[in-house]
Amino acid sequence: MRPTGRSAQQVRPLKLTRHYTKHAEGSVLVEFGDTKVLCNATVEEGVPRFLKGQGQGWVTAEYGMLPRATHSRNAREAAKGKQGGRTLEIQRLIARSLRAAIDLKVLGEYTITLDCDVLQADGGTRTASITGACVALADALNQMVANGKLKKNPMKGMVAAVSVGIVNGEALCDLEYVEDSAAETDMNVVMTEDGRMIEVQGTAEGEPFSHEELLSLLALARGGIETIVQAQKAALID
């Protein structure tokens, strides 16, 4: 029995609140159970130096956790003077995932930055960030079209992510913290809305996993992501 009584295939209650802050071109509060992440999209003219003159845009991301997002206070990374390796890895993952959602040539020479700030962490913060940031990105692009900055929307489709893992020998979808901390295998999967894979991060924390278990986890992730994409699309209609 899982802590909240979910089935092995079931994702946590998912809520996507759009227009959460008023200044950002796209702003979404994403909630997976007790994990809550604020995702803001900012549109700026111009691109990084390595892309200048190529007629294409760029999507990047930053990720951080509030000091009391977890059970005990963690000092702000700004106070330490540098970002940690985990933070850098996660924000690069978010950016790579979202670049797969749009046609950068159609975007033109604009940069969109997704700021993902974890308000409360209970497992799956990176996957929640990708899911919420994709909706914020969609809102920002829709606004650019409405404002005449873009003639065509460069969005190719939704991108979503979920964690899966093996806990006490059972494959589970969308791990909360107590499950994640006890997992023998932990995996983060990012997919397009039509089920193509963008990224798979899998680690055997205890026992190595078999090829069959890998396929089982990927199938579990795909089912969870299908549910998440439906929620993303429903949120964008509201």
UniProtKB/Swiss-Prot annotation:
Gene Ontology terms describing biological process: rRNA catabolic process; rRNA processing; tRNA processing
Name of the protein in question: Ribonuclease PH
Function description: Phosphorolytic 3'-5' exoribonuclease that plays an important role in tRNA 3'-end maturation. Removes nucleotide residues following the 3'-CCA terminus of tRNAs; can also add nucleotides to the ends of RNA molecules by using nucleoside diphosphates as substrates, but this may not be physiologically important. Probably plays a role in initiation of 16S rRNA degradation (leading to ribosome degradation) during starvation.
Similarity comment text for this entry: Belongs to the RNase PH family.
A Pfam family that the UniProt record links to this protein: RNase_PH_C
SUPFAM superfamilies according to UniProt: Ribonuclease PH domain 2-like, Ribosomal protein S5 domain 2-like
Subunit structure: Homohexameric ring arranged as a trimer of dimers.
Keywords of this entry: Nucleotidyltransferase, RNA-binding, rRNA processing, Transferase, tRNA processing, tRNA-binding
Enzyme Commission (EC) number: 2.7.7.56
Main enzyme class: transferase
HAMAP family: RNase_PH
Catalysed conversion reaction: tRNA(n+1) + phosphate = tRNA(n) + a ribonucleoside 5'-diphosphate
GO terms, molecular function: 3'-5'-RNA exonuclease activity; tRNA binding; tRNA nucleotidyltransferase activity
Binding site for phosphate: R86, G124, T125, R126
Cited PANTHER family: EXOSOME COMPLEX COMPONENT, EXOSOME COMPLEX COMPONENT RRP41
Record-linked PROSITE patterns: RIBONUCLEASE_PH
